[in-house]
Curated annotation (Swiss-Prot):
Localization per record: Cytoplasm
Gene3D superfamilies: 3.90.950.10
Protein name: dTTP/UTP pyrophosphatase
Originating species: Exiguobacterium sibiricum (strain DSM 17290 / CCUG 55495 / CIP 109462 / JCM 13490 / 255-15)
Family of this protein: Belongs to the Maf family. YhdE subfamily.
Function: Nucleoside triphosphate pyrophosphatase that hydrolyzes dTTP and UTP. May have a dual role in cell division arrest and in preventing the incorporation of modified nucleotides into cellular nucleic acids.
Record NCBIfam families: maf (TIGR00172)
An individual GO BP term: nucleotide metabolic process
InterPro entries: ITPase-like_fam (IPR029001), Maf-like (IPR003697)
Residues under site feature: Important for substrate specificity: 18, 74, 156
Keyword Calcium appears in the UniProt entry: no
Documented EC number(s): 3.6.1.9
Domain of life: Bacteria
Length: 195
Protein backbone atom coordinates (compact mmCIF):
# COMPACT_ATOMS: atom_id res chain seq x y z
CA UNK A 1 0.00 0.00 0.00
CA UNK A 2 1.20 3.53 -0.79
CA UNK A 3 0.69 6.25 1.80
CA UNK A 4 0.84 9.90 0.80
CA UNK A 5 1.70 12.47 3.44
CA UNK A 6 1.12 16.20 3.00
CA UNK A 7 1.05 19.31 5.15
CA UNK A 8 -1.55 20.88 2.87
CA UNK A 9 -4.93 19.31 2.21
CA UNK A 10 -5.49 17.92 -1.28
CA UNK A 11 -8.79 19.04 -2.72
CA UNK A 12 -10.40 16.91 -5.43
CA UNK A 13 -12.52 19.21 -7.61
CA UNK A 14 -14.78 16.35 -8.67
CA UNK A 15 -17.79 14.41 -7.47
CA UNK A 16 -16.73 11.36 -9.50
CA UNK A 17 -16.80 8.24 -7.34
CA UNK A 18 -14.21 6.65 -9.66
CA UNK A 19 -11.72 9.48 -9.12
CA UNK A 20 -12.23 9.35 -5.37
CA UNK A 21 -11.74 5.59 -5.34
CA UNK A 22 -8.55 5.81 -7.41
CA UNK A 23 -7.06 8.37 -5.00
CA UNK A 24 -8.01 6.18 -2.05
CA UNK A 25 -6.54 3.15 -3.81
CA UNK A 26 -3.13 4.83 -3.99
CA UNK A 27 -3.36 6.22 -0.48
CA UNK A 28 -3.85 9.91 -1.25
CA UNK A 29 -5.96 11.58 1.45
CA UNK A 30 -8.22 14.23 0.00
CA UNK A 31 -11.33 16.31 0.45
CA UNK A 32 -14.03 16.31 -2.20
CA UNK A 33 -15.11 19.75 -3.37
CA UNK A 34 -16.90 19.43 -6.72
CA UNK A 35 -16.51 22.32 -9.13
CA UNK A 36 -19.77 23.77 -10.38
CA UNK A 37 -18.73 25.07 -13.80
CA UNK A 38 -20.31 25.17 -17.23
CA UNK A 39 -18.67 22.37 -19.21
CA UNK A 40 -18.68 24.06 -22.57
CA UNK A 41 -15.91 25.22 -24.89
CA UNK A 42 -15.78 28.98 -25.50
CA UNK A 43 -14.68 28.28 -29.12
CA UNK A 44 -13.84 25.17 -31.21
CA UNK A 45 -11.08 23.18 -29.49
CA UNK A 46 -9.21 19.92 -29.93
CA UNK A 47 -9.84 17.25 -27.31
CA UNK A 48 -6.51 18.10 -25.61
CA UNK A 49 -7.29 21.82 -25.52
CA UNK A 50 -10.81 21.19 -24.26
CA UNK A 51 -9.87 18.94 -21.32
CA UNK A 52 -7.03 21.26 -20.29
CA UNK A 53 -9.39 24.24 -20.44
CA UNK A 54 -12.00 22.48 -18.30
CA UNK A 55 -9.56 21.06 -15.75
CA UNK A 56 -8.07 24.55 -15.23
CA UNK A 57 -11.54 26.07 -14.94
CA UNK A 58 -12.58 23.45 -12.36
CA UNK A 59 -9.38 23.87 -10.30
CA UNK A 60 -9.67 27.65 -10.23
CA UNK A 61 -13.37 27.47 -9.28
CA UNK A 62 -12.70 25.64 -6.00
CA UNK A 63 -9.20 26.90 -5.08
CA UNK A 64 -8.57 28.50 -1.69
CA UNK A 65 -5.24 29.90 -0.43
CA UNK A 66 -2.64 27.28 0.48
CA UNK A 67 -4.63 24.29 -0.73
CA UNK A 68 -3.49 21.91 -3.41
CA UNK A 69 -6.31 21.32 -5.89
CA UNK A 70 -6.55 18.39 -8.28
CA UNK A 71 -9.05 18.78 -11.11
CA UNK A 72 -9.59 16.59 -14.14
CA UNK A 73 -11.80 16.28 -17.17
CA UNK A 74 -12.06 13.24 -19.43
CA UNK A 75 -13.53 12.92 -22.92
CA UNK A 76 -13.66 10.31 -25.64
CA UNK A 77 -12.44 11.53 -29.04
CA UNK A 78 -13.28 9.89 -32.35
CA UNK A 79 -12.33 11.49 -35.67
CA UNK A 80 -12.04 14.98 -34.16
CA UNK A 81 -15.46 14.56 -32.51
CA UNK A 82 -15.61 14.91 -28.72
CA UNK A 83 -17.96 12.51 -26.96
CA UNK A 84 -18.88 13.48 -23.43
CA UNK A 85 -21.53 11.92 -21.17
CA UNK A 86 -24.68 10.78 -22.98
CA UNK A 87 -27.80 12.61 -21.80
CA UNK A 88 -30.19 9.74 -22.41
CA UNK A 89 -30.60 6.26 -23.89
CA UNK A 90 -30.81 7.37 -27.55
CA UNK A 91 -27.60 9.40 -27.11
CA UNK A 92 -25.85 6.41 -25.48
CA UNK A 93 -26.91 4.09 -28.30
CA UNK A 94 -25.68 6.60 -30.88
CA UNK A 95 -22.28 6.68 -29.14
CA UNK A 96 -22.05 2.87 -29.00
CA UNK A 97 -22.83 2.65 -32.72
CA UNK A 98 -20.18 5.28 -33.50
CA UNK A 99 -17.53 3.50 -31.41
CA UNK A 100 -18.40 -0.09 -32.43
CA UNK A 101 -15.51 -1.82 -34.22
CA UNK A 102 -13.39 1.33 -34.12
CA UNK A 103 -10.44 2.81 -32.27
CA UNK A 104 -10.92 5.95 -30.22
CA UNK A 105 -8.91 8.03 -27.79
CA UNK A 106 -9.67 8.73 -24.15
CA UNK A 107 -8.15 12.08 -23.23
CA UNK A 108 -7.89 13.37 -19.67
CA UNK A 109 -6.77 16.86 -18.78
CA UNK A 110 -5.38 17.26 -15.27
CA UNK A 111 -4.64 20.46 -13.38
CA UNK A 112 -2.72 20.68 -10.11
CA UNK A 113 -3.06 24.13 -8.58
CA UNK A 114 -1.73 25.74 -5.42
CA UNK A 115 -1.98 29.52 -5.17
CA UNK A 116 -0.10 30.92 -8.19
CA UNK A 117 1.51 27.59 -9.03
CA UNK A 118 -0.28 25.56 -11.68
CA UNK A 119 0.56 22.49 -13.73
CA UNK A 120 -1.76 21.23 -16.44
CA UNK A 121 -1.15 18.21 -18.64
CA UNK A 122 -3.01 15.61 -20.68
CA UNK A 123 -2.85 11.85 -20.91
CA UNK A 124 -4.21 9.97 -23.94
CA UNK A 125 -5.09 6.28 -24.07
CA UNK A 126 -6.14 4.48 -27.25
CA UNK A 127 -9.03 2.03 -26.94
CA UNK A 128 -10.37 -0.34 -29.61
CA UNK A 129 -13.94 -1.62 -29.39
CA UNK A 130 -15.13 -4.90 -30.82
CA UNK A 131 -18.08 -4.97 -33.22
CA UNK A 132 -20.68 -4.56 -30.50
CA UNK A 133 -23.79 -6.70 -30.94
CA UNK A 134 -26.97 -4.60 -30.98
CA UNK A 135 -28.36 -6.70 -28.11
CA UNK A 136 -25.35 -5.73 -25.95
CA UNK A 137 -25.83 -2.06 -26.79
CA UNK A 138 -29.51 -2.17 -25.84
CA UNK A 139 -28.87 -4.10 -22.63
CA UNK A 140 -26.03 -1.81 -21.55
CA UNK A 141 -27.98 1.35 -22.37
CA UNK A 142 -30.78 0.05 -20.12
CA UNK A 143 -28.42 0.14 -17.10
CA UNK A 144 -27.42 3.26 -15.16
CA UNK A 145 -23.73 2.78 -16.00
CA UNK A 146 -23.31 4.79 -19.25
CA UNK A 147 -24.79 8.12 -18.18
CA UNK A 148 -22.05 9.59 -16.00
CA UNK A 149 -19.11 8.57 -18.18
CA UNK A 150 -17.42 10.14 -21.18
CA UNK A 151 -18.22 8.12 -24.28
CA UNK A 152 -21.01 6.37 -22.39
CA UNK A 153 -19.01 3.42 -21.08
CA UNK A 154 -17.09 2.36 -18.01
CA UNK A 155 -14.10 0.16 -18.81
CA UNK A 156 -14.02 -0.97 -15.17
CA UNK A 157 -17.65 -2.12 -15.36
CA UNK A 158 -19.92 -3.84 -17.83
CA UNK A 159 -18.71 -1.47 -20.56
CA UNK A 160 -15.40 -3.33 -20.42
CA UNK A 161 -17.11 -6.04 -22.50
CA UNK A 162 -16.90 -3.71 -25.51
CA UNK A 163 -13.11 -3.31 -25.23
CA UNK A 164 -11.00 -5.39 -27.59
CA UNK A 165 -7.64 -3.68 -26.96
CA UNK A 166 -6.10 -0.81 -25.03
CA UNK A 167 -2.84 1.05 -25.57
CA UNK A 168 -1.79 3.30 -22.71
CA UNK A 169 -2.89 4.09 -19.19
CA UNK A 170 -5.89 1.98 -18.08
CA UNK A 171 -6.58 4.29 -15.13
CA UNK A 172 -6.83 7.22 -17.54
CA UNK A 173 -9.82 5.48 -19.14
CA UNK A 174 -11.35 5.05 -15.67
CA UNK A 175 -10.95 8.82 -15.21
CA UNK A 176 -7.68 9.61 -13.44
CA UNK A 177 -4.16 8.76 -14.68
CA UNK A 178 -2.74 7.91 -11.27
CA UNK A 179 0.92 7.37 -12.23
CA UNK A 180 1.62 10.80 -13.77
CA UNK A 181 -0.49 12.48 -11.09
CA UNK A 182 1.44 10.77 -8.28
CA UNK A 183 4.76 11.79 -9.82
CA UNK A 184 3.67 15.41 -10.18
CA UNK A 185 2.20 15.58 -6.67
CA UNK A 186 5.75 15.10 -5.34
CA UNK A 187 6.60 18.57 -6.66
CA UNK A 188 3.70 19.90 -4.56
CA UNK A 189 5.10 18.29 -1.41
CA UNK A 190 3.03 15.13 -1.44
CA UNK A 191 5.55 12.30 -1.18
CA UNK A 192 4.63 8.64 -1.68
CA UNK A 193 5.61 6.35 1.17
CA UNK A 194 5.44 2.59 0.83
CA UNK A 195 4.29 0.83 3.99
Amino acid sequence: MILMITQHPLILASASPRRTELLRQIGVPHTIRPADVLEEAPYPMTADEYVMYLSRKKARAVAKPGEIVLAADTVVALDQQILEKPADQPAALEMFRLLSGRTHEVVTGVTLLQDEREETFTVTTTVRFCEIPESWMLSYAATDEPYDKAGGYGIQGKGGLFVEAIDGDYYNVVGLPINPISRRLEAFGIEPMFA
